[in-house]
């Protein structure tokens, strides 16, 4: 059975290679808006929407869709639209704990078998200076990432510790995904 990744994210593509050497990428057409849902519901809802969007384009295969959400005290931080928003997000994360939620939806066609789950990882940031934040924003790294940082890049310098799956923070909880797919026989 063919495997499809419903994602434009180069990080998710790289992570899925840890499980499968061959898969096809079909970018979903979904507006990733911050709804008035809690972070867990939002991550699940967006991953389901992505899977359903790709399911409408294929007849047979296994679809893997994911969405990652960063939240501080239940308040969702999406992808920053500009430097000001990136600054605000990084200032909010500075010296604090936050959670990273990745909702994953698996869909098998034509059987219409579906499974969704959310992986949560806690992340603690060191206190950040304005200079560190501005320098990081100047690197342009924050702009396509939930919460305005990439733990796999220069954003790693801000992380004091994590509790849970590192790859979840990058964008795809590969160990959990592997086990869920194995339960389905893949």
UniProtKB/Swiss-Prot annotation:
Q: Give EC number(s), comma-separated.
A: 3.6.1.9
Which GO CC annotations does the UniProt entry carry?
cytoplasm
Tell me what reaction this enzyme catalyses.
dTTP + H2O = dTMP + diphosphate + H(+); UTP + H2O = UMP + diphosphate + H(+)
Q: Which residues form the active site?
A: 67
What cofactor requirement does the entry state?
Answer: a divalent metal cation
| Organism superkingdom | Bacteria
Location in or out of the cell: Cytoplasm
GO MF annotations, alphabetized: dTTP diphosphatase activity; UTP diphosphatase activity
Q: Which residues form a coiled coil?
A: none
Which keywords annotate this record? Cytoplasm, Hydrolase, Nucleotide metabolism
**Which enzyme type, at the first EC level?**
hydrolase
Matches recorded under Pfam families: Maf
Q: Give the InterPro entries listed for this entry.
A: ITPase-like_fam, Maf-like
Q: Where is this site: Important for substrate specificity?
A: 11, 68, 152
Q: Which Gene3D superfamilies match?
A: 3.90.950.10
| Gene Ontology biological process terms from the UniProt entry | nucleotide metabolic process
CDD domains registered for this protein in UniProt: Maf
Q: Which family does it belong to?
A: Belongs to the Maf family. YhdE subfamily.
Tell me, what does this protein do in biology?
A: Nucleoside triphosphate pyrophosphatase that hydrolyzes dTTP and UTP. May have a dual role in cell division arrest and in preventing the incorporation of modified nucleotides into cellular nucleic acids.
Protein name as catalogued: dTTP/UTP pyrophosphatase
């Amino acid at each position: 059975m063919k495997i499809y990744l419903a994602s434009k994210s180069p990080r998710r593509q790289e992570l899925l290679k840890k499980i499968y050497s061959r898969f096809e990428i079909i970018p979903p057409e979904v507006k990733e808006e911050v709804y008035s849902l809690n972070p867990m519901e939002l991550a699940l809802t967006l991953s389901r929407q992505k899977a359903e969007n790709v399911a409408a384009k294929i007849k047979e295969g296994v679809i893997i869709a994911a969405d990652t959400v960063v939240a501080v005290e239940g308040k969702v931080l999406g992808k920053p639209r500009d430097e000001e928003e990136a600054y605000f997000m990084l200032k909010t994360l500075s010296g604090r704990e936050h959670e990273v939620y990745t909702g994953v939806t698996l869909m098998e066609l034509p059987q219409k078998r579906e499974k969704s789950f959310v992986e949560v990882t806690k992340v603690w940031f060191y206190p950040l200076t304005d200079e560190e934040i501005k320098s990081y924003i100047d690197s342009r790294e924050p702009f396509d990432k939930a919460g305005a940082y990439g733990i796999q890049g220069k954003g790693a310098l801000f992380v004091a510790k994590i509790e849970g799956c590192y790859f979840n923070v990058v964008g795809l909880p590969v160990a959990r995904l592997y086990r869920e797919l194995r339960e389905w026989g893949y």
